[in-house]
Each structure stands twice: as C-alpha cells, then as structure tokens.
Amino acid sequence: MSNTGASLKGLLLAVLLVSNMLLTKEGVTSLPICSSGSVNCQVSLGELFDRAVRLSHYIHFLSSEIFNEFDERYAQGRGFITKAVNGCHTSSLTTPEDKEQTQQIHHEELLNLILGVLRSWNDPLIHLASEVQRIKEAPDTILWKAVEIEEQNKRLLEGMEKIVGRIHSGDAGNEVFSQWDGLPSLQLADEDSRLFAFYNLLHCLRRDSHKIDNYLKVLKCRLIHDNNC
C-alpha cells in the first residue's frame, strides 16, 4: 500500500474512533432512530428533537474547533477577519440574528429555514473535506474534522427531514437554499487567496452552525415544552 493510501486509511480510522467517542459523550448515539421505511415507528417527536439538538451542538462544536485551529495556523497576520464580513453564500437567506427575532417566526417557516441552511451546506462541505487535504502541512485534526462535519451535517439534515415530515404529515417542506460557487476559490494557485477562501468558508460554517443550534433550541422549547423552558 502506498504512503498516501495508508495515510488516508489511518485518517478515516481516526475519524471513526474520535467521532464515536464524541458522539457517545454528547449522548447522540444513544437516541433511537427509525430506519427508512419503518412501519409504526414509536420514536416520539421529542426524541427526534433531542437528537437533532445534540447533533447540531456537536456540529457547532466541531465547526468552532476547526475554525480556531485554521485561524491559529494559517490566518495570523493576514488580515482575513476584516475581509470575511458578509461574505457567506447563505447571506441571501433571510435569517433571524438573535433569540428575540427567532421567537417571532412561525415554527413552519423556521423549520424550512433550517432545512434550507443545511442543504445550502451540502456541496461546500463535500468539497471542503476533499480540498482541505491539499493544504500544505494540514494537520490531521483539521482533516478529520472536515470529514466529520460533512458526515454529521448529512445526519442532521436527515433528522430534520424526519421532524418536518412528522409535523407536516409527510411534507418535507419547499424551502429555498443557496447555491455555492466557491470551489474555484479553494483551488487558487495564489496561497493567500486560497487560504482566505478556506478561512471565509470556515468562518461562515461556524456562524451558520451556531444559528441552527439556536433555532433548534427555540423550536424544541416551543413545540415540545410549550415555551416552558
């Protein structure tokens, strides 16, 4: 086996081991999930929300970790933060900025908004997980977090589709999501420009994962606990 193949195999193994430990610690893996096509599934809406909230919190944790590590390793002294304001591909989606604004939105609209943001990240996360491997001397901790975030975003999206289907009696919503066209920026020959593209993407990921985490907590409180939390 080549060194590259062995390295990739080792990285994937590390992803599986570490993600299993972290998910178990967060309590995500302990929650029951209905398999696709299950009949008379007994998982309650509350349990589905529990799992979604824990999973979104885990994704935000990883997003913050990977951003902070990238910032410390590659962005110091480059002035990236001043250029990253309002540069997210999801900025076209109208999203509440704080808890007070979030509470003013009807739950159906908020659910569709969460679906829209999650689906807006499908494509960029796939390419982030592959392109980050091309960064010079990228540490394994950044590599496996990129792979893990992509996988867990898929799981959260699947969970949210179950929740929306339960609330809307099978309708997964007609949400609008933002297309991402940033792949060429992640492949630029100029190192500073390429690193800024990664920095900006990770900055936006941290921002959006935080929003989703907060939106889900508001929805859980409203729909499961009748705002008594």
Swiss-Prot record:
This is Prolactin. GO terms for molecular function: cytokine activity; hormone activity. InterPro entries: 4_helix_cytokine-like_core, Somatotropin/Prolactin, Somatotropin_CS. Disulfide bonds join C34-C41, C88-C204, C221-C229. It holds the Pfam family Hormone_1. Keywords: Disulfide bond, Glycoprotein, Hormone, Secreted, Signal. Residues 1-30 form the signal peptide. PROSITE patterns: SOMATOTROPIN_1, SOMATOTROPIN_2. Three forms are found, non-glycosylated, glycosylated and one form seems to be only O-glycosylated. Belongs to the somatotropin/prolactin family.
